[in-house]
Amino acid sequence: MEPVLVYNKRETFTKSNLNKLRKEGYIPAVAYGDDIKSLPGYVSKKEFEKLYKQKGLAGKIKILIDGKERTALIKEVQTHYVKGNIIHVDFQILSENKPIYVEVPIVFENAEILKSRGLVLQRQIDTVEIEGLPKDIPEHLVIDLMEYEKPTAIKLRDIKLPEGIKITEDLDEVVAVIDVSEITEEPETEEKKEEGASSVSNS
């Protein structure tokens, strides 16, 4: 069963109040969507960090607001500029029947197969914007490198998309280039050949 993050509403906005929340193990947040203009609140630091580690930025999660379970995107995560800890989170509450635009990671599977084929992968972009209903949005898009046996350029149009999903960017944009690996065995030089012949004649 997918975990549900509890969203607690708050009405005070002072700096001291926000710092108090953080010391008590919470992260200040704001939630917004079609039926929610802007709702300040806070979430459990421990529970959010666990979900964030799994889902990442733009990840889709279940969130409980006013006793109602909703689907939300982790829209923005602010971190302390020195300590690096999370200090604020934005959640976008989704309407199930309205398409959304989301930036998702591109994942390459079976990358190890390229080495055995004398090839190397040169990545050009790591994410791409897609459009679809919230229920159809994947956590990432996959490119299976098992299919590539020679040098080529992989474009956005080459990505196999889940049903109901489309890429909003230029489909001719290059995602990655598969090239010949430059790592080859060092050829034996004339000098080494002569050294080998000399050692044989002296033995």
UniProtKB/Swiss-Prot annotation:
GO cellular component term of the entry, any = cytosolic large ribosomal subunit
What's a BP term from Gene Ontology annotated to this protein? Answer: translation
At the top level of its lineage, which domain of life is listed?
Bacteria
The record's CDD domains line, in alphabetical order, gives: Ribosomal_L25_TL5_CTC (cd00495)
Q: Which SUPFAM superfamilies match?
A: Ribosomal protein L25-like
Write the record's keywords in alphabetical order, separated by commas.
Ribonucleoprotein, Ribosomal protein, RNA-binding, rRNA-binding
GO MF annotation terms: 5S rRNA binding; structural constituent of ribosome
Map out region (Disordered) in residue numbers: 182-203
Please give the subunit comment from the record.
Part of the 50S ribosomal subunit; part of the 5S rRNA/L5/L18/L25 subcomplex. Contacts the 5S rRNA. Binds to the 5S rRNA independently of L5 and L18.
Please describe what this protein does.
Answer: This is one of the proteins that binds to the 5S RNA in the ribosome where it forms part of the central protuberance.
Q: Which protein family is named in the record?
A: Belongs to the bacterial ribosomal protein bL25 family. CTC subfamily.
Q: NCBIfam families from the entry?
A: bL25_bact_ctc, PRK05618.4-5
Name it.
Answer: Large ribosomal subunit protein bL25
Q: Provide the species name.
A: Caldicellulosiruptor saccharolyticus (strain ATCC 43494 / DSM 8903 / Tp8T 6331)
